[in-house]
Design a protein with these regions (language model features):
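N-terminal secretory signal peptides
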Residues: 1-36
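Extended, compositionally biased flexible segments
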Residues: 68-174
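Catalytic-pocket segment enriched in acidic/His residues
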Residues: 69-91, 107, 134-137, 188-302
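Structural motif
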Residues: 96-98, 120-122, 155-157, 178-180, ...
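A generic structural signal for short beta-strands and their flanking turns/coil linkers
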Residues: 117-119, 126, 152-156, 175-181, ...
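Short, structured patches in soluble enzyme cores that scaffold and shape functional sites
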Residues: 125, 154-156, 160-162, 180-185, ...
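Hydrophobic, well-structured mid-protein blocks that either form specific transmembrane helices
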Residues: 166-202
Length: 302
């Protein structure tokens, strides 16, 4: 435990600038009533006033300077975001959710972009956007507020066990812990409105339960996904139908490019982009995501 340099008046920040203010310090034999910090500075000099324990012995507030912020008590608890791991009692702790935009050429074109010219771009969702979908079950997914054009986007999700900066593409897949199937749900009208106004469009992408996801399968169980049929059905009708080998940027390239902008870490997950034919759903619709090698993802809009 350590005493603070002085007893500050309520609302005053402690710094080399504010220590010059005129608030009185607690009286003591060395600091009679009415003594201010400026008086102490005149007597001892600035360095002495800042560093002398003798001149300010009467200050009584104490702080624990050795305690790590991570070990201190908090006023409330925040639940961690996790996703179950197939074949394990452990769960995967989600640190960040990265998403790549327009990563299939046909989808890029349907969104008004030229995939032959544009580099990859990424955005994020909050970790609590995760909505877990157990295999073999259908999960109710609430239709979100503020939208009249709610879209599905089926995607392969890569989960990282390690990370770093400027990861070489040749090393990128060694950082992958496993894979899952997910939906990047989108309030398309809000996204487009923000885009038209040149504003960030998180309101269209980064909202509650906007990231339904199945359980994570470890690489040892599935291998890496460089190809495979990926589909999204609505009420049994195929809406999206493509192959993972049609990605503009594969998973290894995505990891490498992302690490140029962010320090990737264990717990990060990457939604790897959606094929063409995204479209709207309404309450009562059943979405079924399919990917060869992973269980179906069944989500009902309510």
């Amino acid at each position: 435990m350590s005493r603070e340099p002085c007893a500050l008046a309520k609302g005053t920040r402690r710094s080399n600038a504010t220590i010059l203010q005129q608030e009185e310090i607690t009286s003591s034999p060395s600091n009679p009533p009415g003594t201010t910090r400026r008086d102490v500075l005149k007597t001892l000099g600035t360095a002495g006033a800042l560093g002398s324990a003798t001149a300010l012995t009467a200050c009584s507030t104490t702080v624990n300077v050795s305690a790590s912020p991570t070990t201190r008590a908090t006023p409330f608890q925040i639940a961690a975001t996790t996703s179950p791991i197939v074949g394990s009692n452990e769960v995967f702790p989600v640190r960040r959710i990265y998403c790549i935009g327009r990563n299939y050429a046909a989808h890029a074109r349907e969104m008004g972009s030229d995939p032959t010219r544009e580099p990859p771009f990424f955005f994020q969702k909050p970790t609590d956007a995760i909505q877990f979908v157990p295999p073999g079950q259908t999960v109710d997914h609430p239709y979100p507020p503020l939208t009249k054009n709610y879209h599905y986007e089926i995607e392969l999700v890569a989960a990282l066990k390690s990370g770093g900066r400027n990861i070489a593409m040749a090393d990128a897949l060694s950082h992958v812990y496993g894979y899952a199937l997910g939906l990047d749900m989108t309030r398309r009208d809000l996204q487009r409105a923000m885009g038209d106004e040149k504003k960030p469009w998180e309101i269209g992408k980064s909202f509650d339960r906007s990231a339904p996801i199945g359980p994570i399968h470890r690489v040892g169980q599935t291998g890496h996904f460089s190809k495979g049929r990926i589909q999204l059905l609505v009420n049994g009708n195929v809406k999206q139908n493509a192959d993972l080998n049609q990605m503009i940027w594969n998973v290894a390239e995505q990891i490498s490019k992302l690490s140029e902008a962010f320090e990737l870490m264990a717990g990060d997950i990457i939604y790897s982009g959606t094929p063409e034919n995204v479209g709207p759903v309404v309450r009562g619709d059943l979405m079924t995501g399919k990917l060869e090698g992973l269980p179906d993802l069944n989500v009902k809009v309510v």
